[in-house]
């Protein structure tokens, strides 16, 4: 069965870049959310195998969404995306249960390595 991945970022171009990278490498069950609140709602609806989520977003940021998701499912696989210079936020995310973090702008092979490590192959 295909692995479901939820891509969460308020920037449409970042979601598209992630989607393109993953779809070119065999991941087909890709879903999108535009902010943390949308991510929590879609997590409940889709039960994805992995969530890749930005930290800085409107309405509900990635850290709040991470805590909400992990509160619902303690085994949820969540990877945070962050720009350079947000190291303290990244450490907060890891302490809150994030499996890994990817620095933006990301390199496609770094995204794939992280996804493959957590989920196995496509």
Q: Which ranges hold each PLM region?
A:
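Acidic catalytic/metal-coordinating carboxylates
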Residues: 35-38, 61-64
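Active-site beta3 strand of CheY-like receiver
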Residues: 46-52
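Receiver (REC) domain active-site loop signature in two-component systems and cognate sites
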Residues: 57
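C-terminal output helix
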Residues: 88, 106-115
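Short hydrophobic/Thr-rich beta-strand motif most characteristic of the beta2 strand and flanking loop
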Residues: 27-34, 42
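Charged docking surfaces used in two-component/phosphorelay signaling
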Residues: 16-24, 91
